[in-house]
Amino acid sequence: MRLPPDSVVGDVNDGWTVALALLGHERNAVGGGSPYVSGRNYLAEGADGARDLSSIALVRSRGIDGDAVARQLVAEAHVLDVAQRGLVQRVTVGMGNGKLAGQAAAITKLFTATSAERKTEIRLALAGTDAVTWPAGEETLGREAGESFLERQATSLAGGSNEIQRNIIAERVLGMPREWAADRDVPFRDVRRNAMPTAPSGA
């Protein structure tokens, strides 16, 4: 398929720059700092935005809101929620006024991914057996907790894995030296690859 020249995004032969910009926007969106998302937008909510009440609803539905361990878990989920909101605000303002590089979106992306995983673990613990068994066809808080736990890795992959975010933070935000790589500054077409396995003799 051939496209006309006016369909090119960015400069010809400079697609990597466009791809990096796209990934940066994706990281910002997944991290909760973009107004152009359909999911939760911590930036728009502000410091006093709506709280995540799913953990509280769970303990109340199971009648364990007086349990000391359950209350500690609910408090942990609340702290993660408040910390994320403050982090998104600070990083977004920093990128806007130039005090932080645009790649700083990796900070909110990484925190969002790790805190989301932890909050799904908390909801699973609070739901107990309700997270693995429920009346057929019914949408319950326990079912939601169980299904969210099974999907918990999604946020760690969208916009780049946690390991990639740590590399971005280290190299492009903190200015630390890059890891050594044998193929650095080598055109992709010249990067050495593993040889294709040969078929066994007589196959």
Question: Where are the regions a protein language model picked out?
Answer:
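Glycine-rich beta->alpha junctions and the first turn(s) of the following alpha-helix
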Residues: M1-R85, T155, N194-A203
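Acidic/polar loop patches that form or flank catalytic/metal-binding clefts of enzymes
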Residues: D6-V9, L124, E179-A182
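Hydrophobic alpha-helical scaffolding
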Residues: V9, E45, G102, K109, ...
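Glycine-rich phosphate/cofactor-binding loops in nucleotide/flavin-utilizing enzymes
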Residues: G15-P35, A131-A203
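Generic, well-ordered alpha-helical scaffold segments in large soluble proteins
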Residues: L22, S54-L58, R62, L73, ...
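Catalytic-loop motifs flanking and including active-site residues across diverse enzymes
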Residues: R51, L80-A83, T108, E163-I169
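C-terminal helix-coil-helix/basic helical segment that borders enzyme active sites and/or dimer interfaces
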Residues: A68-R71, V82-T140
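A glycine-rich phosphate-binding loop feature that marks nucleotide/adenosyl-phosphate handling sites
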Residues: L73-E76, K109-F111, P187-V191
